[in-house]
Amino acid sequence: MIIYLMSYRICVKRTKGLWSIYMIVLTPSIEVRIHYTEYKQR
């Protein structure tokens, strides 16, 4: 049980790290897309 909890915690840390990298990569592209759609609608 303790080993399971520790492995779960490590997994959560890994997914959080991946998620933060994913968001850092994705956020600028989302902003660019929003600006692009606004520009096209004019």
UniProtKB/Swiss-Prot annotation:
At the top level, the lineage of the source is: Viruses
This protein is called what? Answer: Uncharacterized 5 kDa protein in M-Rep ORF
UniProt source species = Banana bunchy top virus (isolate Autralia)
